[in-house]
Amino acid sequence: LNPPSERYRGEDGKVLVDGIRSINFHNTGLWVGYYTTDLVAVIDLASFQHVSSVEVSALTDLSAWIMGPQSISVFVSLDGEKYEMVSRQTYQAPTDAMGEKRSDLNRLSFDSVPARYIKVVAEPFKGLPKGHSGEGEPPFLFVDEIRVN
């Protein structure tokens, strides 16, 4: 796990795989927050399994300088050393400077592959949107759940 922002550690990442989706407020302790760094999380499935999708729950709350991810990439590995990318998805920045507060469940589907380890990389947007009071400043990226199917 790439270290999150000191203020938003989410039990050192444990909340990412606890099966609980948080409400749309970043200060519940159930969100893991990143500022100017990518979320990089590795999930050990404890055994070889066939995997065909990964879901990543991310928060958008522009009033708190929080945007969802610019992109999410999913990698799989049998040994935890060599990873292969199986999916990558990019997202559009909100066009409304303040927008709504919401939690999005981003699903990345791919052909079923055997894996023991799943690496998820979520890249934040580089700047808040035009018209925002912090236009161009880096936003936070908040994630509260990663599900492997």
What are these regions (language model features)?
Residues L1-S22:
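Predominantly extracellular/luminal regions of secreted and cell-surface proteins
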Residues E6, G99-R102:
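A broadly tuned preference for mixed-charge, low-complexity surface segments
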Residues Y91-A97:
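Surface-exposed loop and turn segments in beta-propeller and other repeat-based domains
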Residues L1-N2, Q92, S112:
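Selective for proline/serine-rich intrinsically disordered segments
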